[in-house]
Amino acid sequence: MLKMTEEHDKCVSDQPCSPSGTNSSMSQDESDSDAPSSPTGSDGQGSLLTSLGRKVDSEDDERFPACIRDAVSQVLKGYDWSLVPMPVRGNGSLKNKPHVKRPMNAFMVWAQAARRKLADQYPHLHNAELSKTLGKLWRLLSESEKRPFVDEAERLRIQHKKDHPDYKYQPRRRKNVKPGQSDSDSGAELAHHMYKAEPGMGGMGGITDAHHHAEHAGQPHGPPTPPTTPKTDLHHGAKQDLKHEGRRLIDSSRQNIDFSNVDISELSTDVISNMETFDVHEFDQYLPLNGHTSSSSSLPSDQPPAPVSSYASSYGHAGVNGPAWSRKGAMPSSSPSSGEVGQHRLHIKTEQLSPSHYSEHSHRSPPHSDYGSYSSPACVTSATSAASVPFSGSQCDYSDIQSSNYYNPYSSYSSSLYQYPYFHSSRRPYGSPILNSLSMAPAHSPTGSGWDQPVYTTLSRP
């Protein structure tokens, strides 16, 4: 069909070739374009078009010169017209019935009559402008002036009811929104909920209550998880793509820090760790188990335990008094370990940028002596700093929460060996590491003094 119309257009533009003017070829073109709209099947359409082609040939004998006829037949000969798809509009079965229009209302009666009259008088008027003017005029009409149009509309309605007793108005359905678009909308809405929930976290007491309640009820009060990820993710058979999607959403929500309460010096580690966290587990999936152990030996041996001491501080702290939590820079330098912790922070701040260091941290099992030396003093300092530094919700130590992502001594194990769920923080919303640490802390430290040594000896690498 398309090539036929192209040929005809060529004929139209080629005035010397076509002896009988444009109108004849145009009418032929119109008859061609109208033909496929008849609701026949593809076979019927093929036969219809072949008969049409014969008719075209017989008519073209007089209408077009021999050069054009030969060119057209040459083009049409090699084309299988049964392959041309029928234009399907809506339901094929409904197309067999003629479309019944709704009866006109009073305004339509007025507008149609007035438009005909005006179009005859002022043919240069644009249709849209005409419609606007007719609408304005209709609003200015009084009830008595509208009466004849209202009566006519009523008569048409009654007539329509007689003609089509079982008529039901079926407006055209809008096409469904593209799936990608709806997903992004729900994602944006979800992120909006997360951002909205974050500044209102208030004091730590509220967090502990809410998260304990969420732990028991299974319906979180914190930022909602994405609708696709499972609610309780302790079984790690979840699909990888869902996990990554959820993690990206959550990580993007973590970046919304209340900058009025955060020291600028702390910001670099927080932002960097938040930006790059989801890469770590992707490295863990694709790298061999001991991929970086050889190169990790060149790292300073005292570097990794800094996050562990911050773990110990937060967990011991939660055991001692929940409602207050210390900021990073607020630990008093009363014990030597807190100063060293600060130095280690600086080390990590410089090294965090390269992803290979992430994997080196995560594949490496630190020396056990460090745990013994760092866990209990850090708890003491955190307990003292708890009294001195009250906690405000947005000062939550993001990099401590994150540290299970970029520094995880047990990531070389299979995920079923992870005993405690706060090592899976990448699969949960950012509040849940706090949640799990608060609820699980008594398991580690019944007295609230620190982490038990056997946890590390049992889980360290053989």
Curated annotation (Swiss-Prot):
InterPro entries, A to Z: HMG_box_dom (IPR009071), HMG_box_dom_sf (IPR036910), Sox_N (IPR022151), SOX_TF (IPR050917)
GO aspect biological process, one term: neural crest cell development
Organism: Tetraodon nigroviridis
Primary location: nucleus
Function: May play a role in central nervous system, limb and facial development. May be involved in male sex determination. Binds the consensus motif 5'-[AT][AT]CAA[AT]G-3'.
High-level lineage: Eukaryota, Metazoa, Chordata, Craniata, Vertebrata
CDD domains named in the record: HMG-box_SoxE
Record-given protein name: Transcription factor Sox-8
Biased composition (Basic and acidic residues): 1-12, 155-169, 209-218, 232-243
Annotated compartments: Nucleus
Gene encoding the protein: sox8
Biased composition (Polar residues): 15-50, 446-462
